From Swiss-Prot:
Belongs to the RNA polymerase beta' chain family. This is DNA-directed RNA polymerase subunit Rpo1N. (Microbial infection) Binds to viral protein RIP (AC Q3V4R7), which inhibits global transcription. Zn(2+) 1 binds at residues 58, 61, 68, 71. InterPro entries: DNA-dir_RpoC_beta_prime, RNA_pol_asu, RNA_pol_N, RNA_pol_Rpb1_1, RNA_pol_Rpb1_3, RNA_pol_Rpb1_4, RNA_pol_Rpb1_5, RNA_pol_Rpb1_clamp_domain. GO terms for cellular component: cytoplasm; DNA-directed RNA polymerase complex. CDD domains: RNAP_archeal_A. Gene3D superfamilies: 1.10.10.1950, 1.10.132.30, 2.40.40.20, 2.60.40.2940, 4.10.320.40, 6.10.250.2940, 6.20.50.80, RNA polymerase ii. NCBIfam families: PRK08566.1, RNA_pol_rpoA1. Zn(2+) 3 binds at residues 573, 575, 580, 582, 584.
Length: 880
């Protein structure tokens, strides 16, 4: 068979003759099976249409199930019907051409000129040719008299979905499909071309169906239900309805039935043919099963997420994959994933037998499919597969294998697999991990790996895929391993890093009050692979003590320099340089942590230009992996030793603090009352550009916002600096000072759409308030804290504010998902060429220099090509 190169794909409309030629049989009866359950010849399951049962031979091509592609049949329609997919095209043809002579309603000399222009531009500038066609249609539709035959033209209206009405001498006449077909037949080929169609492959009258193609059985196979009853495909049901109606229409015409009955049956045939193509036509009731379920017809098989394109071509279900719940395991390396034994025994990797690995593989074969590490299949050099479940003497088989065999063995420690969590919103939602087979029934994941996957452990499930070829495994190992993706391609900062307990532990270990004995240091270092001298303790007498900073310094490169504020550098503890009494400015000189604490700004995930970021960027991702596998584990160990809990005592403030807050609330309420009094007396000064009512709302909101801030400051002033809740908030481990304010002092103003709550009953939010009351409490201000508890109406307002967040989340998720899909489809053919330009599939330049600087964000210094300050700091240990 000679090879051919595909130059292009051309779409057209099937002519009635083409439908008959590609058909192997006419479908003439609505009966499907006879009494024995054998398909009837001339029915919709005629054996000539293809084979769906194994062992049968196709009477047309002689092939079995594996080789028979299926064959088309056809139904000769008694009356023509409109193809629902071409209604708009038919409408354009009818309005642009004369009903009598079929010519475009434009003068002959103008038509000749348009033809010359169209022929000159149609190949070189197809978009310009399309605009010319639209222009021809536009001016032709406007003409009320045919310039060729002089006939008066009537206005045609489309009554959706497929009825065409014509206004003739004041009355409205419905055009039948036969009449429409006659008109379309009269349009000459030259005019069809000027209206944008190729008359060789798309004559307009072919859009009115006289012959309906019947698809092969292979695309609409029947299934046998457990009870032994055959269930037919939705398309088969629809085709039976069409044939049944076609027969009734034929009988009615032959019996000389009244025109009204014939037209009703014709309309019904039109409905069935339309819903056969698309069962979701606006304005048309969908065809349904007896159960009430709408039929899934041709368009539904192609459209949407579950359709043929997105469901079976762009995305497929795959083998060698697993899915289960994820659990945290801080003892795994960031590059590893814990896999249950059950899954490790089911998923296999093909390993080729060589003289080096033959003994190990023989042991896998002896272990078999049920004992880990074993094997499930042996593939001989001739391609035959041996299933080890059915081999009685596995030892004999193991001894017979030689180099060249392939064994599908179980997953073992160190195998490379792909790990993914949906929704996969960016590239690093799928990364490669190394297998660690563990007991249990869940996947185990290091907590540091959560941010790129956006994973947590409240029931999330993740997918695992096992690459099968050496090339795929090599690509995954070189490009996709977790430590090679610590720096995100989004902005060039570390997406993997500390969070929650890691940050609390790092802060408590690095804070200047932390002193450790040699034994405690040894306990902490026991979870790391540190080997080396501890150095001299910071305190020698009365007892040797190391500081937490000394322990952390053991893991920093000896030439590493860094300066920068910590997360706790806020308010009264803020520091701008190294002269800092609050320990809130980090100074690392020649690998020694001299000052400052490690918190979110130093080691947190998604923190660009942090200590973690520069150390990974300058010493490589292997160092970053080592740091996370050791130092971060050490932070957790220290937290375990010290203990870290949260109790009600942590959010209880003394009475004097509560009295201060109550006084401030009263002052705030008085201020609001004063604004309301001024408003009622007409003395309130409006804010420029706002109405007096808007100004009042703005003044009240500002006052209540200040009140919440003051209450929060009072509450935190009375909290112990080593209060665990306070530590979590100031270090950036979890929560914020606002959360502390809400737990200890007051919740503050609840808002809906950025305003105070105003909807409810007429002129008041709830029935317990007076009409027209706009005081803080009547409009959603909550003066209680979570600790003290909310009153019933405060609880109601709080729920109203919370609901807005839930609705927002649901709406934005679907909107952003759809926007991303459109963006991906629009940008999918862009790529960076070797000359640095960004080009489309056709070579069009979209960007002369990628990103205007030709720098990959992943390898940039936080989106800059070079950070000069950092270069100076790195070399001389000081910033400019």
């Amino acid at each position: 068979m000679s090879e051919k190169i595909i130059r292009g794909v051309k779409f057209g409309v099937l002519s009635p003759n083409e439908i008959r030629q590609m058909s192997v049989t006419a479908i003439i009866t609505s009966e499907v099976y006879d009494e024995d359950g054998t398909p009837i010849e001339g029915g919709v399951m005629d054996p000539k249409l293809g084979v769906i049962e194994p062992g049968q031979k196709c009477p047309v091509c002689g092939n079995t199930l594996a080789g028979c592609p299926g064959h088309f049949g056809h139904i000769e329609l008694i009356k023509p019907v409109i193809h629902i997919g071409y209604v708009k095209h038919i409408y354009d043809f009818l309005r642009s051409t004369c009903w009598r002579c079929g010519r475009i309603k434009i003068k002959e000399q103008d038509l000749e000129r348009y033809k010359r222009i169209y022929n000159a531009i149609k190949l070189r500038w197809p978009s310009a040719a399309r605009r010319l066609v639209e222009y021809i249609k536009k001016i032709s539709i406007k003409n009320l008299e045919c310039p060729h035959c002089g006939e008066k033209q009537f206005k045609i209206k489309l009554e959706k979905p497929y009825n065409f009405n014509e206004e003739r001498n004041g009355s409205i006449v419905k055009l039948s499909p036969s009449e429409i077909r006659d008109r379309l037949e009269r349009i000459p080929d030259s005019d069809v071309e000027l209206l944008g169609y190729d008359p060789k492959s798309s004559r307009p009258e072919w859009m009115i169906l006289t012959v309906l193609p019947v698809p092969p059985i292979t695309i609409r196979p029947s299934i046998t239900i457990e009870s032994g009853i055959r269930a037919e495909d939705d398309l088969t049901h629809k085709l039976v309805d069409i044939i049944r109606l076609n027969e009734r229409l034929k009988e009615s015409i032959e019996a000389g039935a009244p025109q009204l009955i014939i037209e009703d049956l014709w309309d019904l045939l039109q409905y069935h043919v339309a819903t056969y193509f698309d069962n979701e036509i606006p304005g048309l009731p969908p065809a349904k099963h007896r159960s009430g379920r709408p039929l899934r017809t041709l368009a539904q098989r192609l459209k949407g997420k579950e359709g043929r394109f997105r469901g079976n071509l762009s995305g497929k279900r795959v083998d060698f994959s697993a899915r289960t719940v994820i659990s945290p395991d801080p003892n795994l390396s960031i590059d590893e994933v814990g896999i249950p034994y059950t899954i490790a025994r089911m998923l296999t990797v093909p390993e080729r037998v060589t003289n080096i690995n033959i003994e190990r593989i023989r042991q896998y074969i002896i272990n078999g499919p049920d004992k880990w590490p074993g094997a499930n299949y042996v593939i001989k050099p001739d391609g035959r597969r041996i299933d080890l479940r059915y081999v009685k003497d596995r030892k004999e088989l193991a001894s017979s294998i030689t180099a060249g065999y392939v064994v599908e063995r179980h997953l073992v420690d160190g195998d490379v697999v792909l790990f993914n969590r949906q929704p996969s919103l960016h590239r690093i939602s799928m990364m490669a991990h190394k297998v660690r087979v563990l007991p249990g029934r869940t996947f185990r994941l290091n907590l540091l790996d959560c941010p790129p996957y956006n994973a947590d452990f409240d029931g999330d499930e993740m997918n695992l895929h096992v690459p099968q070829s050496e090339e795929a495994i090599a690509e995954a190992r070189e490009l996709m391993l977790v430590h090679k993706n610590i720096i995100t391609p989004r902005y060039g900062g570390p997406i993997i890093g500390g969070g929650q307990d890691y940050i609390s532990g790092a802060y408590l270990l690095s804070v200047k009050t932390t002193l450790l004995t040699v034994e405690e240091v040894a306990t902490i270092l026991g979870v790391t692979d540190f080997v080396g001298e501890l150095g001299e303790p910071a305190i020698l007498a009365p007892k040797p003590y190391y500081t937490g900073k000394q322990v952390i310094s053991l893991f920093l490169p000896k030439d590493f320099n860094f300066h920068g504020p910590a997360n706790i550098s806020k308010g009264p503890r803020a520091c701008k340089d190294e002269i800092c009494p609050h320990d809130s400015f980090i100074v690392i000189k020649n690998g020694l942590l001299l000052e400052g604490v490690f918190d979110k700004k130093a080691i947190g995930n998604q923190q660009p230009e942090s200590m973690l970021h520069w150390s990974i960027r300058e010493y490589g991702t292997e160092y970053g992996k080592w740091l996370m596998d050791n130092v971060f584990k050490m932070f957790i160990r220290f937290l375990e030793m010290r203990g870290f809990t949260m109790t009600l005592e942590d959010i209880t403030i003394p009475d004097e603090a509560q009295n201060e807050i109550t006084t401030k609330i009263k002052e705030g309420y008085s201020q609001v009352d004063e604004y309301i009094r001024k408003f009622n007396e007409g003395q309130l000064e409006p804010i420029p550009g706002r109405t007096i009512e808007e100004s009042l709302e703005s003044y009240i909101l500002d006052t209540l916002d200040k009140l919440r801030k003051v209450a929060g400051e009072i509450a935190t002033k009375y909290l112990d600096p080593f209060n665990n809740v306070y530590i979590m908030a100031i270090t950036g481990a979890r929560g914020s000072e606002l959360n502390i304010t809400q737990m200890t002092a007051l919740l503050g103003q609840q808002s809906v759409r950025g305003e105070r709550i105003r909807r409810g009953y007429r002129e008041r939010t709830l029935s317990l308030f007076k009409y027209g009351d706009i005081a803080p409490e009547a409009r959603g201000f909550v003066k209680n804290s979570f600790m003290r508890g909310l009153s019933p109406y405060e609880m109601f307002f709080h729920a109203a504010g919370g609901r807005e967040g839930l609705v927002d989340t649901a709406v934005k998720t679907s909107q952003s998902g759809y926007m991303q899909r459109r963006l991906i489809n629009a940008l999918s053919d862009l790529r960076i060429e070797y000359d640095g330009t960004v080009r489309s599939l056709y070579g069009d330049i979209v960007q002369v220099v990628y990103g205007d600087d030709a720098v990959h964000p992943m390898y940039s210094a936080h989106s800059k090509s070079v950070n000069v300050n950092r270069v100076i700091e790195r070399v001389i240990g000081w910033k400019r």
